[in-house]
Regions:
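Long, charged, low-complexity, helical-prone intrinsically disordered regions
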Residues: 1-171, 175
Length: 175
């Protein structure tokens, strides 16, 4: 019978907020889908949690050009941020992000940071879809390069690209 490391509901919510900030990487202290399922957490409580996490040195604030609200990241991730900012040998890579990837939890933040609007259209009736049934955002380096609709054909082990939509053709390099 070990004691509960989180003595009350507030401590539990605080722990979950810190975990969410770590999962997404960068969040703001405002209403967000990133806070879903942190039961009964009201705005005033969230604001208090952020104040405490800041005063305890568990999160750090950062200002991003073009965004009025401060954003926050975990203090334990600061060395990683410094490494990324100092990396002169950076080579961008391409990632297809799953619709429920934690990076995409706050769609409004993604729009503010990247100018990229994403909606998972799996439950949208076909005639109302803008893109497709199961479209994945394409992250290339530090930008959203587009969207891809692909299907894995299990029998042939082939990835069939049904459609691709580019956000900015200047990102495309053909060798």
């Amino acid at each position: 019978d070990s004691p509960d490391p989180l003595p009350d509901d507030f401590a539990h919510k605080k722990w979950r907020v810190l975990r969410r900030i770590g999962a997404v990487g960068l969040l703001w202290n405002r209403p967000s889908d990133a806070w879903l399922n942190i039961w009964d957490m009201k705005s005033l409580e969230r604001i208090q949690i952020f104040k405490e996490l800041l005063s305890e040195g568990k999160i750090l604030a950062v200002q991003v050009e073009g965004i009025s609200a401060e954003l926050y990241y975990r203090a334990e991730d600061h060395p990683l941020l410094e490494t990324v900012l100092e990396n002169r040998d950076y080579k961008p890579r391409c990632e297809f992000l799953a619709p429920l990837d934690c990076f995409l939890w706050d769609r409004k933040l993604i729009k503010a940071l990247f100018g990229f609007e994403y909606s998972w259209e799996i439950y949208t009736p076909a005639p109302k879809r803008k893109y497709g049934f199961y479209v994945l955002p394409i992250l290339y380096g530090d930008r959203f390069a587009g969207r891809i609709e692909a299907v894995c054909q299990l029998k042939t082990n082939v990835l069939l690209v049904k459609n691709i939509w580019y956000e900015d053709l200047s990102l495309i390099h053909i060798s």
